[in-house]
A protein has these predicted regions:
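Residue-level signal for secondary-structure boundary sites
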Residues: 81, 112, 175-177, 210, ...
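Catalytic lobes of large eukaryotic enzymes
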Residues: 124, 128, 132, 136, ...
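Active-site metal-binding loops of divalent metal-dependent hydrolases
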Residues: 78, 107-109, 172, 218, ...
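N-terminal, active-site-proximal structural segment of metallo-dependent hydrolase catalytic domains
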Residues: 1-154, 164, 226-227, 234, ...
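Residue-level detector of short, conserved catalytic/binding motifs and their immediate flanks
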Residues: 71-74, 102, 167, 200, ...
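Structured beta-strand-rich core segments of catalytic domains in phosphoester-bond hydrolases
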Residues: 51, 116-218
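Extended hydrophobic secondary-structure segments that form protein cores and membrane-embedded regions
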Residues: 73-74, 103-105, 154-160, 167, ...
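Short, surface-exposed loop/turn motifs at beta-strand boundaries within globular domains
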Residues: 64-71, 97-99, 160-162, 195-197, ...
Length: 412
């Protein structure tokens, strides 16, 4: 007698292709995307046992307290370049004191050609990036000020949609405090559905506080009116992003189902908003480091002032050069050298990090100097207020069979 798995019929290749084209996924697949990333990503052994195979411990709440973990958030459009194995990421990831959580988002992790957009997903570059990040974060070193050894970081979530790639890393000692990991993808590319543009959102709970990290790649273009298409992308991402509805085992009721339902929200990515000036005018202001004059013509700032997009969202002060577009392996803006045939693009801050809601305080907002692609990475460090159960007596309950959400661990 054949087992159940062997009797299941795989959907025809045409149906699989249509599902990819239109980013159609069932509820089970949405869970599976996260679970595969966690349990098979090399760091997920602590979550590999099924929820129905073990008992759950709940905390009887008697008092609350607050934590203030630091979160390092970064976005980088790598231009479809597969990272060399010896690529040094120290200047990017080790530019700040150790954070508790690292949220690292990429765009164009693969070239956005027809094969990658319409065909099978190419995850080879993603594996290389994960390996390099793990090696960098966990390299032996000491903090000069305290002499403390490096904390060890685990990859708790990762998700790829064509060229967009989002990863979340946490300190080892925090792994049991991260629960309810879920993912939502929205395609905004060809036909408004394909994944060459769009977003990946990861939802999670840290103790009693919900977090949502949104990594996006919005519509490109520097023609007048293109900013309105980017506004539309943002509105569609907010409208269409939905996380699988499940009950929170901590007893807090239903988990957030939309991006804006979360307590702490950070949006990162290549937003592609440009500077509404000529190439020469923008280049002259950039060379003079006159950021304020450039930012007066920044499309994102203008659209926010007119309340057409990201109303109520915050962004840190920009005090660094534009992040796009640079010539290969150079600090020269693309198109400056008339002897070289290359696309001429007005210098702009395409790569941004924003946040929404209370409980988040940005400690720094900087630009990296890697010349790997035509974009420069942008990163910020946040201090986040997190509610937790300080003390209480544990009560034991049996887990529901088949549930995919994480266990409520016994807190100290």
């Amino acid at each position: 007698m054949s087992d159940e798995s062997s009797t299941r019929r795989k959907p025809p290749w045409s149906k699989c292709l249509v599902r990819k084209w239109f980013n159609i996924k069932s509820k089970g697949q949405l869970f599976q995307d996260v679970d595969d990333s966690i349990s098979k990503g090399g760091d997920g052994e602590w979550r590999s046992s099924s929820f129905s195979e073990r008992e759950t411990w709940r905390v009887k709440k008697t008092r609350r307290g607050d934590l203030m973990p630091e979160i390092f958030v970064s976005t980088w459009n790598v231009g479809g370049i597969c990272p060399p194995l010896r690529l040094n990421l120290d200047d990017w990831l080790l530019s700040s004191p150790f954070a508790d959580i690292y949220v690292l988002g990429f765009q164009e992790i693969v070239p956005l050609n027809a094969g990658n957009v319409l065909g099978a997903e190419n995850n080879a570059p993603a594996k290389k990036w994960v390996s390099l990040i793990r090696k960098t974060l966990n390299s032996p070193r000491e903090q000069a000020a305290t002499g403390a050894m490096t904390p060890v970081y685990l990859l708790v979530a990762r998700k790829q949609m064509v060229g967009i790639f989002l990863t979340v890393w946490v300190r080892t000692e925090m792994k049991d405090d991260v629960r309810n990991l879920r993912v939502s993808c929205v395609g905004r590319g060809l036909m408004g559905r394909l994944g060459n543009k769009g977003s990946i959102s990861i939802s999670m709970s840290l103790h009693e506080t919900s977090f949502c990290f949104v990594c996006c790649h919005l519509t490109s273009g520097q023609r007048e009116g293109d900013e309105l298409r980017r506004n539309s992308d943002v509105m569609e991402i907010l409208r269409r992003s939905r996380f699988p509805p499940v009950d929170d085992l901590a007893g807090e009721g239903r988990l957030p189902e939309t991006i804006l339902d979360h307590s702490r929200i950070i949006w990162l990515g290549d937003l592609n908003y440009r500077v509404a000036l000529s190439h020469n005018a923008a280049r002259s202001l950039a060379q003079a480091r006159d950021w304020s004059s450039l930012l007066e013509n920044d499309q994102l700032h203008k659209e926010q002032r007119f309340r057409r997009v990201f109303e109520g969202w915050k962004e840190g002060k920009i005090s660094f050069p534009p992040t796009y577009k640079y010539s290969a392996n150079s600090d020269r803006f693309s198109g400056d050298d008339l002897k070289v045939r290359e696309k001429r693009r007005t210098p702009a801050w395409c790569d941004r990090i924003l946040w929404y809601g209370s409980g988040l305080s940005q400690l720094s907002y900087l630009r990296g100097d890697s010349k790997l692609s035509d974009h420069r990475p942008v990163f910020g460090v946040f201090s986040a207020e997190v509610e937790l159960v300080c003390c209480g007596s544990p009560t034991k309950s049996m887990a529901c069979s088949g549930s995919r959400i994480e266990v409520e661990e016994l807190l100290p």
